Amino acid sequence: SKGNMAVLNMLNTKYFITPKGQAQQNPGAMGNAWFVDTINIVPNADAEIAGLNEFNPATTAIVDARFSKQIIDSLDNTAANIVLIVYKPNYLQYNSSSTNDGIAIFSEIYYSKGWNAYVDNKLTPHFRANYVLRGMQVPAGNHTIEFKFEPPSYFTSEIVAYVSSIILLLLLGFVSYTEFR
C-alpha cells in the first residue's frame, strides 16, 4: 500500500479494497481504543501532522502543545485494556482497566464542540491526539468512560420546541372551545 499504514491503523481501518475489487483484512487495525506509553508534544498542528509520518500509534501519541495541560507523564500500561461497550451516533461507552494512570487514545474523530467526556459519570477533559483522534487521561483502576454529544444549541432548541408545542396545543384548545361555544 502506498498510504501511511500507521495512520490507517490508528483510524481502525479494518479492510482494504484491492485493485481487483477484493476485500483484504488489515491485521494492523488498532481497534476502538488503546493506551499509549509515550506522548510526543509538538508545537503546533503542522508538526502534529508531520509527526504522523514516522510514529507507532500503538505506543505513541502526538499531541499539539495547546493540549499539553491535560497530559500526564504516561506510564507503562502494557497490561491495561479498554473496550468499547456501546456505540451510538451521539453516545460512546468504554470500560477500562489499568494498574497505572495513563493516556487512552480513542479511534474517534476529535470534535470539541458539543462532545463531553466522562469517567465514572464525572466530567473529564479530553484532547486531540494524532491530529484527528481523541485522547484522555484515564486514572488507574476499573472505569466506565463515556463520550456524550451534548451541544447547548440542541438543548435550547429542544426547550423552544416543547414550549412551542404547548403554546400550539393551548391555542388549538382555545380555538376549539370558542368555536363550539
Which functions belong to the PLM regions below?
Residues 8, 56-181:
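Active-site-proximal, structured, solvent-exposed surfaces of multi-pass membrane proteins
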Residues 1-77, 99, 122:
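Extracytoplasmic
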